[in-house]
Amino acid sequence: MTSMASLFSFTSPAVKRLLGWKQGDEEEKWAEKAVDALVKKLKKKKGAMEELEKALSSPGQPSKCVTIPRSLDGRLQVSHRKGLPHVIYCRVWRWPDLQSHHELKPLDICEFPFGSKQKEVCINPYHYKRVESPVLPPVLVPRHNEFNPQHSLLVQFRNLSHNEPHMPQNATFPDSFHQPNNTPFPLSPNSPYPPSPASSTYPNSPASSGPGSPFQLPADTPPPAYMPPDDQMGQDNSQPMDTSNNMIPQIMPSISSRDVQPVAYEEPKHWCSIVYYELNNRVGEAFHASSTSVLVDGFTDPSNNKSRFCLGLLSNVNRNSTIENTRRHIGKGVHLYYVGGEVYAECLSDSSIFVQSRNCNFHHGFHPTTVCKIPSSCSLKIFNNQEFAQLLAQSVNHGFEAVYELTKMCTIRMSFVKGWGAEYHRQDVTSTPCWIEIHLHGPLQWLDKVLTQMGSPLNPISSVS
C-alpha cells in the first residue's frame, strides 16, 4: 500500500480516477504518464472528461467519441516511447497485451476512427474491437481419387517455372499497388461455383508478359472442390468469413460426407521460423516465433528476448565489406505481426526492405515472383490465411501437384537495404548482402496433412524436366 501511495503522491485527482479502470498491473508509471498527457488534452474540451469516464464506467452502454488532435505523424509520445493514440489507450483500459493497430477495428458508431485520417482521432477504448482470428473451414479431400491425369497441372507448373522471368519484376508500395483485379478463374459454362479473383495477365505488374499463374486453371479442368460462396478475396477481408457448416451441402450437393475427408487447420506453437542469410550462406540458427509480434533488427540484445531476432549478434567468417556496411544500415529492421490470420511487415529501418511473397502478389494481381519494395515507416500485408485456405480448397480437385505447388506460397523472402530484380543489378535474393527467409508453419503443416491424405502424386515431384 505504501508503494501505491508514493506512486500517486503527485497525481491529479482526475488521473487517479481514470487509472482506477486500468487493466493489468505492468508499467504503472508509463500508464500514469499516458493518462496524465490525455487529461491535459481533454480538459481543453467541454464534456470530454465526463464522456470518457462514462465510457469506462459503463462498458456496455453507448458512448460518444472522445477525441484528441491528430499529430503530424499520427503518433503520440509518452515517456520516450511513441505509439498510436488509440492503441495506447486501448492498451491502458482494455487489452494490456495489445501489440499493434492491426489488432484493432473501429465500431460503426465511431465518427473519428484512427484510420479515417481526420484532424481529430477517437481514443474511446470502447469504440474499437479486437480483431479475432477467423476459423478456417476444413479442406475436404476426396477419399477416392477420381482425378483425371489429363487434367494434371504439373506440365503447366513446370512450364511456368521454366518460363518465369530470369529477373523478378519489381513493385513499390504504395505507388504500384491498386485494388486487386477480379478476373475470375476460367470455369466451365455450367459450373455452379462462384468465380475467384485472379489475374490472367498480372495487370498490375510492370511489363506483364509470360505464362499465366499456376492458379489460373484451364477451362477443361474440373471445378474446385470447395470454396465459400462469397467472393471475398478481392476485398480486404475485413469481415470474418462465414465458416458455418450449412454452406457445404449448398456448394457440394453431389458429394456426401462419406466421399471426403475433412482436414482442419490447426494453429502451431510457433507461427513462423526465420532464417538469416548473407549472400547464399545461412548464418546462425533459425529463430522460432511464438510471439505474434516479432522484431528483426540489426542490433545486439543479450537478454534472449523471445519476440526479438537480433541479427547483430550473428557472426560469419566469410563476411565481406559490403555485408558489413549493409548490416550497419539494417537498424531497427522490420516488425512482423501475425494478427487475425494475417501477416504484416512494417519497415522500421531508415532503409527500405524488399519482400517476395507469392500470397501478396496473388492478392494484388502481380506476377508470383514480383519483389515489393516497402519504404521506411510503411506497412504491408504479406500473407492472408483466408485467401490461402480458398486456394488450397480449390486445388485439391486438381491433383497432388497443384496442392504441392502451394508450398512456395508459405515461404516469404525479405532483404534489407539492397533490393533485387529487374530494376536492380542483383538478379536473385542470394545476391543481396543480408536477407531472411520466413517459413509459415501453420499453412505448411496444413498442406502436409492435406498431401498425406491425398496419397502419392500421379507423377513423381522432381526438379528434372
Curated annotation (Swiss-Prot):
<keyword id="KW-0804">Transcription</keyword>
<dbReference type="GO" id="GO:0003161">
    <property type="term" value="P:cardiac conduction system development"/>
</dbReference>
<feature type="domain" description="MH1">
    <location>
        <begin position="13"/>
        <end position="137"/>
    </location>
</feature>
<comment type="function">
    <text>Transcriptional regulator that plays a role in various cellular processes including embryonic development, cell differentiation, angiogenesis and tissue homeostasis. Upon BMP ligand binding to their receptors at the cell surface, is phosphorylated by activated type I BMP receptors (BMPRIs) and associates with SMAD4 to form a heteromeric complex which translocates into the nucleus acting as transcription factor. In turn, the hetero-trimeric complex recognizes cis-regulatory elements containing Smad Binding Elements (SBEs) to modulate the outcome of the signaling network.</text>
</comment>
<dbReference type="GO" id="GO:0070411">
    <property type="term" value="F:I-SMAD binding"/>
</dbReference>
<dbReference type="GO" id="GO:0005634">
    <property type="term" value="C:nucleus"/>
</dbReference>
<feature type="region of interest" description="Disordered">
    <location>
        <begin position="163"/>
        <end position="249"/>
    </location>
</feature>
<dbReference type="GO" id="GO:0031625">
    <property type="term" value="F:ubiquitin protein ligase binding"/>
</dbReference>
<dbReference type="GO" id="GO:0007165">
    <property type="term" value="P:signal transduction"/>
</dbReference>
<dbReference type="GO" id="GO:0071144">
    <property type="term" value="C:heteromeric SMAD protein complex"/>
</dbReference>
<dbReference type="GO" id="GO:0030218">
    <property type="term" value="P:erythrocyte differentiation"/>
</dbReference>
<dbReference type="Pfam" id="PF03166">
    <property type="entry name" value="MH2"/>
</dbReference>
<dbReference type="GO" id="GO:1902045">
    <property type="term" value="P:negative regulation of Fas signaling pathway"/>
</dbReference>
<dbReference type="GO" id="GO:0043066">
    <property type="term" value="P:negative regulation of apoptotic process"/>
</dbReference>
<comment type="subunit">
    <text>Homodimer. Forms trimers with the co-SMAD SMAD4. Interacts with PEBP2-alpha subunit and SMURF1. Interacts with SUV39H1 and SUV39H2. Interacts (via MH2 domain) with LEMD3. Interacts with WWP1. Interacts with TMEM119. Interacts with ZNF8. Interacts with RANBP3L. Interacts with HK1. Interacts with HGS; this interaction attenuates BMP signaling.</text>
</comment>
<feature type="modified residue" description="Phosphoserine">
    <location>
        <position position="463"/>
    </location>
</feature>
<dbReference type="GO" id="GO:0006879">
    <property type="term" value="P:intracellular iron ion homeostasis"/>
</dbReference>
<feature type="modified residue" description="N-acetylthreonine">
    <location>
        <position position="2"/>
    </location>
</feature>
<keyword id="KW-0496">Mitochondrion</keyword>
<keyword id="KW-0007">Acetylation</keyword>
<dbReference type="GO" id="GO:0005739">
    <property type="term" value="C:mitochondrion"/>
</dbReference>
<feature type="binding site">
    <location>
        <position position="110"/>
    </location>
    <ligand>
        <name>Zn(2+)</name>
    </ligand>
</feature>
<dbReference type="GO" id="GO:0003700">
    <property type="term" value="F:DNA-binding transcription factor activity"/>
</dbReference>
<feature type="compositionally biased region" description="Polar residues">
    <location>
        <begin position="169"/>
        <end position="182"/>
    </location>
</feature>
<dbReference type="InterPro" id="IPR013019">
    <property type="entry name" value="MAD_homology_MH1"/>
</dbReference>
<dbReference type="GO" id="GO:0001673">
    <property type="term" value="C:male germ cell nucleus"/>
</dbReference>
<dbReference type="GO" id="GO:0051216">
    <property type="term" value="P:cartilage development"/>
</dbReference>
<dbReference type="GO" id="GO:0010629">
    <property type="term" value="P:negative regulation of gene expression"/>
</dbReference>
<comment type="similarity">
    <text>Belongs to the dwarfin/SMAD family.</text>
</comment>
<dbReference type="InterPro" id="IPR017855">
    <property type="entry name" value="SMAD-like_dom_sf"/>
</dbReference>
<keyword id="KW-0597">Phosphoprotein</keyword>
<dbReference type="GO" id="GO:0060395">
    <property type="term" value="P:SMAD protein signal transduction"/>
</dbReference>
<dbReference type="GO" id="GO:0032991">
    <property type="term" value="C:protein-containing complex"/>
</dbReference>
<dbReference type="GO" id="GO:0060348">
    <property type="term" value="P:bone development"/>
</dbReference>
<feature type="compositionally biased region" description="Low complexity">
    <location>
        <begin position="198"/>
        <end position="214"/>
    </location>
</feature>
<dbReference type="GO" id="GO:0001227">
    <property type="term" value="F:DNA-binding transcription repressor activity, RNA polymerase II-specific"/>
</dbReference>
<feature type="compositionally biased region" description="Pro residues">
    <location>
        <begin position="186"/>
        <end position="197"/>
    </location>
</feature>
<dbReference type="GO" id="GO:0048863">
    <property type="term" value="P:stem cell differentiation"/>
</dbReference>
<dbReference type="GO" id="GO:0005737">
    <property type="term" value="C:cytoplasm"/>
</dbReference>
<feature type="binding site">
    <location>
        <position position="65"/>
    </location>
    <ligand>
        <name>Zn(2+)</name>
    </ligand>
</feature>
<dbReference type="GO" id="GO:0071141">
    <property type="term" value="C:SMAD protein complex"/>
</dbReference>
<dbReference type="GO" id="GO:0005829">
    <property type="term" value="C:cytosol"/>
</dbReference>
